[in-house]
């Protein structure tokens, strides 16, 4: 029966055969069996709970970055080199703090190219780099927002609540690692275990717009801090960093550990390998450095600038799986 039907279709005029193929494709598409080409990517769908004008700032800069990335074929670079290429393109961007505090109650992934802090600098550089690999052209702000959400929120999903965002780098590293999005080679590089009692968010809650407007979230934030305090966090003491620099890679995310007993880390940036060592690219708040994104100096030299700099954590992002919904793979907040 089916063979006869197939031969009957083949005998029809080309327009009829074309319509038949379209019907079959649409059927398979609805069944989730048809390939979508570039659309069948690792980029989850982004659904904003706030207007795009609120969650995405700097569209012209985004368009310029996309144009440059295509011209210089950044998509062909390994993930680390790609992340660093994006970071270098953002050099000179002004340092601006609290850019994630965009509403009194509703939480959403957001991107602001007009101003970056140390965390959003690495985060946007990485998300943009992943976007270039996860999709073949037609890059949209929604794609970047989706990949920021994948990195920034617990299990890769923002539920509209402030506490779905991870507010501590250590949790981001653990959560993304558990979902197969990164590795943490710090321990293998000779790292030592750190012990901290995290309390930054509850101690400084009035500094955060969402917590000021809804203090009822403080008890749950305290519970999150307890969980982060219990994570197995390793760091490489600054006295040893120069000796292990050769093992670092361009695009590694470098978190600076601190001596303060209420926090593991105080700063973060991107590693860039140069002939004379591995340099630290970061968004700095220092006025003598211009309060902007800079390619500073060797990481080991940067650590020597302050007694508060205790060491480093090395976080190595990986390429996104394709086309697996990594956001839903259960894993393990500034």
Feature-to-residue mapping (PLM):
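Bacterial N-terminal signal peptides
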Residues: 23-32
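Boundary at the C-terminal end of the N-terminal hydrophobic targeting segment
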Residues: 36-40
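Cationic-aromatic interfacial patches
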Residues: 42-120, 125
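Acidic/His-rich structured neighborhood in mature extracellular/periplasmic domains
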Residues: 90-231, 273, 282-285
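Short, well-ordered loop/turn sites that connect or cap secondary structure elements
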Residues: 247-248
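C-terminal soluble interaction/assembly domains
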Residues: 254-320, 328
């Amino acid at each position: 029966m089916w063979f006869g039907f197939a031969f009957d279709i083949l005998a029809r005029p080309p327009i009829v055969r074309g319509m038949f193929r379209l019907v079959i494709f649409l059927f398979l598409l609805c069944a989730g069996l048809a390939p979508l080409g570039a659309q069948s990517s690792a980029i989850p769908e982004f659904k904003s709970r706030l207007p795009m004008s609120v969650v995405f700032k700097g569209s012209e800069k985004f368009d310029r970055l996309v144009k440059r990335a295509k011209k210089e074929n950044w998509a062909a670079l390994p993930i680390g080199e790609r992340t660093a290429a994006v970071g270098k393109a953002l050099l000179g961007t002004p340092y601006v703090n609290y850019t994630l505090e965009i509403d009194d109650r509703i939480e959403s992934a957001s991107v602001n190219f007009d101003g970056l802090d140390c965390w959003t600098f690495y985060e946007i550089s990485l998300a943009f780099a992943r976007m270039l690999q996860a999709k073949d052209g037609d890059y949209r702000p929604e794609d970047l927002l989706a990949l920021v959400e994948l990195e920034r929120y617990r299990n890769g999903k923002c539920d509209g609540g402030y506490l779905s965002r991870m507010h501590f780098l250590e949790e981001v590293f653990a959560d993304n690692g558990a979902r197969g999005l990164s590795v943490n080679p710090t321990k293998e590089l000779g790292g030592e275990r750190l012990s901290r009692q995290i309390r930054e968010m509850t101690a400084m809650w009035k500094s955060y717009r969402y917590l000021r407007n809804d203090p009822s979230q403080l008890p749950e934030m305290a519970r999150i801090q307890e969980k982060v305090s219990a994570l197995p966090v390793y760091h490489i003491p600054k006295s040893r960093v120069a000796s292990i620099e050769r093992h670092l890679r361009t695009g590694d995310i470098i978190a600076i550990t601190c001596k303060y007993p209420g926090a593991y880390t105080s700063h973060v940036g991107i590693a860039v390998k140069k002939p004379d060592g591995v340099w630290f690219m970061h968004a700095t708040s220092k006025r003598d450095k211009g309060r902007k994104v800079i390619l500073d100096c060797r990481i080991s030299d940067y650590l020597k600038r302050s007694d508060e700099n205790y060491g480093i954590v090395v976080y190595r992002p990986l390429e996104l799986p394709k086309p697996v919904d990594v956001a839903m793979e259960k894993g393990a907040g500034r």
